[in-house]
């Protein structure tokens, strides 16, 4: 009869579940850490750009809010990074956001927007050609411009040239489906807000209002789709 020595019972060490997961899936966990660090870098860069843009707008006498600009810049960068990863579309969305932010503040200040903003959006649209398709972009931009030029002619100056230039450039970037949806969404938000605001402030409905901020909201919303 062979007597085997009795080995002492040793309880396994208590390991933090997070550490255990990291050890078991170290490759995935490491990639996640790297991704988070990259997102933080993108958000930080966006925050710095937002700060510089805000200073530039202040020097030009624009209506602006530093806190809003910095928070919106950071949130937009994180949101786009979560949606598209660290792809070219994330950076396209970030720069589109800054262009629309600049256009919105300019519109709120004196109802004008420099032509270089819409031209910059058109240049940024080149990134969309492989995924959206140039035909869709061209149709969307043309339809948007035609509709809004007609509205401009019928409104007697109530619908500004900057409005249709910015929105048509955005529709061109997004393609006809998403672009026109963003335009309609932005216009709808703008009309509802203006009706409520004019009612509260007892403001004349015939007075003009800044439309580009609402168009920007609609366009950035559908950019995530």
Which role fits each region the language model picked out?
Residues 1-225:
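A membrane-topology feature that recognizes alpha-helical transmembrane segments
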């Amino acid at each position: 009869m062979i007597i085997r020595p009795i080995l002492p019972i040793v309880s396994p060490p208590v390991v933090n579940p997070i550490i255990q997961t990291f050890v078991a899936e170290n490759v995935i966990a490491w990639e996640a850490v790297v991704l988070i660090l990259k997102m933080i870098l993108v958000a930080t860069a966006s925050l710095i750009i937002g700060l510089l843009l805000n200073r530039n707008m202040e020097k030009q006498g624009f209506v602006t809010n530093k806190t809003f600009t910095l928070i919106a810049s950071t949130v937009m960068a994180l949101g786009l990074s979560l949606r598209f990863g660290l792809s070219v579309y994330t950076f396209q969305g970030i720069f589109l956001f800054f262009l629309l932010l600049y256009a919105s503040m300019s519109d709120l200040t004196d109802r004008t927007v420099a032509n270089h903003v819409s031209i910059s959006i058109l240049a940024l649209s080149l990134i969309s050609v492989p995924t959206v398709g140039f035909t869709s972009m061209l149709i969307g931009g043309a339809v948007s411009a035609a509709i809004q030029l007609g509205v401009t002619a019928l409104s007697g100056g109530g619908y500004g040239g900057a409005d249709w230039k910015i929105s048509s450039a955005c529709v061109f970037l997004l393609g006809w489906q998403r672009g026109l949806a963003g335009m309609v969404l932005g216009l709808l938000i703008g009309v509802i807000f203006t009706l409520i605001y004019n009612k509260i402030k007892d403001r004349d409905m015939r007075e003009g209002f800044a439309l580009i901020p609402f168009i920007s909201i609609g366009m950035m919303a559908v950019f995530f789709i």
